[in-house]
């Protein structure tokens, strides 16, 4: 199952970012893999729950449309006003900002004192894009924890058991470097 591999890498990257000094690259990787894992899991559930050819639906539908279709057919509710499903949109907005990144001109008014600016070791903070401001330890934790909760909820609501991370086929782990 692709989602198992993606989730394993997501968990690895999140752990590395949480424990390491150089958090940024690991958080970026884990936050992107939250989106990839969630969408792969939605595709997995659609194929298991609804036999037939769903490839057109998978390719043409957004992750939110896939989630809505699953909830409609299986009869469960995802409250997008509360966590964890409140985070769903943020995960995919972040993913889209990166996947569809464009060069932009950023301008910002700075209140950085001129005397500090003139010191060689002091520079004003650079303006950041939306995705760069989202790339924080707090958001990496929220994306990871809420994605894990969403996967567990969807797994249970699909009638497969209580914990997709404890099932035999989901115990796959990967060691070493990417």
Summary of predicted features, one role per range:
Residues 1-27, 155, 174-178:
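Charged alpha-helical initiation segments
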Residues 134-178:
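A hydrophobic membrane-anchoring alpha-helix module
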Residues 43-61, 108-111:
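Short acidic alpha-helical/loop segments enriched in Asp/Glu that coordinate divalent cations
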Residues 104, 108-131:
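An amphipathic alpha-helical core segment
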Residues 83-111:
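Histidine-centered, metal-coordinating catalytic motifs and their short helical/loop contexts
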